[in-house]
Amino acid sequence: MGMSIKIRTILLERKMTIKMLAEKIGTTGNNLSNKLARDNFSEQELLEIAEALGCDYSASFTMRDTGKTI
């Protein structure tokens, strides 16, 4: 599942619009809509979005052969 789908799912659960989220992170609704369409976010943007949505965000890699998460 891409980040855009995850963000849109949380927006639905929080009863928020893209415009509302955009205002919270200091961008325009059009800019955020474009990023969601491309599923193209920097790590910093994801942290800001998570904070605005009242969520924790962590990025990690899990090795398939050992299950070790880095």
Which functions belong to the PLM regions below?
Residues M1-M16:
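A short, Lys/Arg-rich alpha-helix, primarily the initiator
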